[in-house]
Amino acid sequence: TEDTVTQLRNHTDRKIIIRPHPLYRKSSLHSNLREKVLRVADVHWQEADVRKPEFIPIAEQLKKAWCTVTYSSGTGIDAVINGIPNVACDSGSMVYEVSSKEISEVEHPFTGDKSKWANKIAHCQWSIKEFESGECWEHVSKSI
């Protein structure tokens, strides 16, 4: 995160909001990292604990977002589905094929067609009935 913030600041003057993984807040490294990244100009730390009043849901923050920068986070999926460009820093990201790949692209992120990707993602969702009928396994087992 620290390196990512530094790289981002080299490529944009926009406000940077860090949204740590909700489980990360339990780590002892959490406060040290928070202190380090907040030293960088115009960097903000979003509270990850949903029980605290300063928590803002991702859907709310995306309404004001220019772009998201993720590794393999579900936030990238939320962003892309809501029309917000993403920079995917990890090839394992579910939005890798519809994202910019380099932090240096943050000011001009990928905004191309995502319909093929959306169709593929839609086929990753299964109902209980499809699990029970074996349809899900029939589809998934071809990839193993």
Where in the sequence are the language-model features?
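Hydrophobic anchor at the start of a short beta-strand
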Residues: 14-16, 43, 86-87, 115-124
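Short hydrophobic beta-strand element within catalytic cores of glycosyltransferases
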Residues: 68-69, 85-89
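Leloir-type glycosyltransferase catalytic cores
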Residues: 97-144
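Well-ordered, non-membrane alpha-helical segments in soluble/globular domains
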Residues: 1-8, 30-36
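Short beta-alpha junction loops
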Residues: 20-24, 91-94
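Short, acidic/turn-prone active-site loops that include or flank metal/cofactor-
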Residues: 48-51, 91-96
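Flexible glycine-rich beta->alpha loop in the catalytic core of nucleotide-sugar glycosyltransferases
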Residues: 74-75, 85, 92-93
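Donor nucleotide-activated moiety binding/catalytic core segment of transferases
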Residues: 14, 22-77, 81
